[in-house]
Amino acid sequence: MTKLKTISYLSPNLFWFYQEVVQAIARRCDCHIELIAANCDPLDDCLLNQDKIDIAFICGLPLIRHNRIAKQPLEILAVPVMQGDRYQQQPIYFADIVVHADSNFYEFSDLAGSRFCYNDRGSNSGYNLLRYQLLQHLQSLFPSQTLPANYQFFRLSQASGSHQNSLQWIASGLADCAAIDSIVMAVELRQFPELAQSLRIIESIPSRIPPITISSRLYNQLGGGFVKEMRQSLLDPDVSLQKAMELAEVSLYTTASINDYAEIGMFYDQGISANFNIL
């Protein structure tokens, strides 16, 4: 029996759903799939770097950065489309800029001099998208000029370690703002509805949703027909996966190209070329 190794680099609050996804693939393809939760950044993971991962649930930014240096790049198997009007039946999610409900922050410019927290610097929703937004904001303030040396928009920036921690920091007053993965936030508010009373979204930045990816090696190793069946298990889910998708508020799975994620890489590159960090 074919055995596949799968890893999730995404938030653990939907790990149960990723288990349902890989089980659906296993049923359709008559294979065994082991799913593990990552304990390090994808770019630091020797298993991924040595092409020992077959399937990966991964954020768009580390996907792009990994593929720039990988001998065997990752390819997109399928992408989820979330339920809810804000997602417009498109494979997108948002970096929701969250503040305390009782704060005096109402728009992005109000955040100057505030305390910012982020899950980690490798995160698209938690760091990359907000950095790009901030860079655009500062360039509008200083047109045709380089940013002043050692310019700081935020009074303080701290790594919280996770989106969940960032939400708790804001609710408890340890931080003023954070950019939060909209899917992670929705799950947290379903699990802890009382948290919603302490939080408010002042702006949302759309981006391509984290995809399910496979090593390009699988085409030669298992054949294009096998990969097609893997993909079909998501595009045409069985009853068991449909039930899990409903609980996870996933409307459907669809196809996507790695080129759809180029904008994420462009935002990252602009932040790097400007030598700009949120500090």
Spell out what each predicted region is.
Residues 78-94, 193-231, 246-259:
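Periplasmic-binding protein-like
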Residues 33, 225-279:
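Segments of small-molecule ligand-sensing domains
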Residues 31-41:
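A short beta-strand-loop structural module common to alpha/beta enzyme folds
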Residues 47-110:
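Acidic, polar ligand-binding/catalytic clefts
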Residues 2-28, 38, 89-166, 241-251, ...:
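Bilobed "Venus flytrap"/periplasmic-binding protein-like clamshell domains
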Residues 57-71, 135-136, 169-172, 176-196:
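A ligand-binding cleft/hinge motif common to bilobed small-molecule-binding domains
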Residues 39-40, 59, 162, 181:
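Short loop/turn segments at beta->alpha junctions
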Residues 43-47, 53, 63, 163-169, ...:
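Short, hydrophobic alpha-helical packing/hinge segments within bilobed ligand-binding/sensory domains
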